Amino acid sequence: MRFVIVTGMSGAGKSTALKMLEDMGYFCVDNLPIPLLPRFVEMFSEPDEEVKKIALGIDIRGGQDFGGLKDVLDEMDVKEIEYEILFLDAQDDVLIKRYKETRRQHPLSGSGRVDTGIAKEREKIMFLKMRATYILDTSKMLTRELKLELEKIFVKGQNFCNLYITVMSFGFKYGIPSDSDLSLIHISEPTRPY
């Protein structure tokens, strides 16, 4: 059985990722209450169970107790139940923009500001990011790019590549691209004398 927990920041694309995993043949459940998780895992861990690929969306909606999730994951480790955690993240400014576009309120902002809710959420789910098998930053991803990444990880059986090399052209006067980790070469054409 392949058991995937899809989690991450609100607005980073968890629901979209779950829909894509469902299209890839996964049995998907979104926003399962954490107290039901042990029974859910136990039910689908039986060898004669027909469902072999499960994706479970867990997030901060509904004020779930993430301390309880840590205990459940520890218990799964003790029982040697294999699972993978897919953590979807995005830059704060991108998350704020997405909330503005949808005109939805962040689950932890209450009647306050979205950026305050994002900061609270980052703090609460940091332990999940630390335990994550895969971390995807969706800040600059299009939906089709997210689908390709998920297919690489969950369908084609390819190992997740931690090193990507992208050759791109940019002008320093506009700044280094924000998704660039390292700019190795700066090539300028010398001025021509004629």
Predicted features along the sequence, with ranges:
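P-loop (Walker A) phosphate-binding loop of NTP-binding proteins
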Residues: 9
